[in-house]
Amino acid sequence: MTDTISRNIIFIIIMLLLTALVVSDPSYAAAATGSASGLGNVDNVLQSIVTMMTGTTAKLIATICVAAVGIGWMYGFIDLRKAAYCLIGIGIVFGASALVSKLTSAS
């Protein structure tokens, strides 16, 4: 039993390492580009994360999640409070960029 669990853990670790190796982008390890903030490539990495979280793929995933939550609520698998939490969370994720830009604007 313990042998099976340890084999599964080792397998998962190996698969995670292989996935990280395959999907890693060489541009993240490139030299700094000399941005205005002096952080170089860190700005690009953070912007890529924001784009990933609010881009087209994220909108498609959010649409599927809203539909799944709606169906779950309709059939009684999810109560209304959890459905509302899901929708509020999606609103916060997609509204974060606009909220931060309003808070940091000079006007």
From Swiss-Prot:
Keywords: Cell outer membrane, Membrane, Signal, Transmembrane, Transmembrane helix, Transport, Virulence. The keyword Transmembrane helix applies. It is a multi-pass membrane protein. Residues 1-31 form the signal peptide. Induction: During the interaction with the intracellular environment of host cells. The keyword Acetylation does not apply. InterPro entries: TrbC/VirB2. It is found in: Cell outer membrane. Pfam families: TrbC. It comes from the Bacteria. Belongs to the virB2 family. The type IV secretion system VirB/VirD4 is a major virulence determinant for subversion of human endothelial cell (HEC) function. VirB-dependent changes of HEC include massive cytoskeletal rearrangements, a pro-inflammatory activation by nuclear factor NF-kappa-B, inhibition of early and late events of apoptosis, leading to an increased cell survival, and, at high infection doses, a cytostatic or cytotoxic effect, which interferes with a potent VirB-independent mitogenic activity. These changes of HEC require the T4S coupling protein VirD4 and at least one of the effector proteins BepA-G. Homooligomer (Potential). Interacts with the 17 kDa antigen protein that is encoded within the virB locus. This is Type IV secretion system protein virB2. It comes from Bartonella henselae (strain ATCC 49882 / DSM 28221 / CCUG 30454 / Houston 1) (Rochalimaea henselae).
